[in-house]
Amino acid sequence: MTPAGRFAPSPSGRIHLGNILCCLLAWLSIRQKDGRVLLRIEDLDTARCPRRYSEQMLEDLHWLGLDWDEGPEVSGPQEPYYQSERTALYEAALQKLTEQDLVYPCFCTRAELHAASAPHREDGQVLYAGTCRDLTAEQIAEKSLLRAPAQRLRVPDELWSFTDGHMGFYQENLARDCGDFLLRRSDGMFAYQLAVVLDDAAMGVTEVVRGADLLDSTPRQLYLYHLLGLKAPEFIHFPLLLTADGRRLSKRNADAGLDDLRPRFSAAEILGRLAFLAGFNPDASPKTAEELLKDFSWDKLPREDIRIPDGFFADKGAV
């Protein structure tokens, strides 16, 4: 099988430096293997991801020199490449899992899920307590009169492990560390975990490059691959890009977004500085994606989060 990587951004705003680093690493990693690059737009939440944001994202990626072989504008055998247009695939998989008695309706509200008494992981994430796991048919019918349910996947009390291409060995007990997780929300929107597994498998993705914040999503996704009889890709997680004071970047951080950076820097200047922070550009000199190919190696990247020094992207002379 031809190696295939992808970048799959969510167009909820202008892309920021963290998004750019993700796309760059995915592009470099698969291009070094002479593989194909897919672009998929993860716009399941259409209210937060209007099409104009997707169009701007495509233009930004072109400007950065990060091209793709399949996806919006170039088409391909697995179109459409917008998740909002692929819901029939997700519906069929949900039905298959439901018929195996692996899915159940959940009527818990957000407030109930996040109550102080709810079980939490050490990192503060809420674990589902299994409140609706064993409802009777009568209870389900009664609760359905009051609100539409979400759909959750039953997980076993088992360890699921994998060896990440950069972070190394990782494992979780699905019941203890994850809990039964959502496949579809109560408003009908399919969950990321189901959609990403189905799309990566359908599109022949062999390598998934993404931020370390998604490392703990991998065991539950591997479980879904197993249940659905699909071949899982290799996973490579990279350290997160943080502000100087340790905050996660988001599309609300205007100083890290391309709307602020494009008027002041060339694409090569942005990529060169990001590559320097990530450890595979010996200095912060401007480099195109093509020029970075010869120096890129996963061995050069750190495993701990990367902080952007104060003023590093303030102006061209800040380095």
Task: Give a label for each model feature.
Residues 1-14, 32, 37, 64, ...:
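Non-catalytic terminal extensions that flank enzyme cores
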Residues 111-250, 257-261, 313-314, 319:
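Active-site cores that bind ATP or allylic diphosphates and position pyrophosphate for catalysis
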Residues 59, 92, 115, 134, ...:
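Charged/polar, solvent-exposed surface patches and flexible loops
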Residues 42, 73, 237, 261-262:
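Sparse recognition of residues in long alpha-helices and their boundaries
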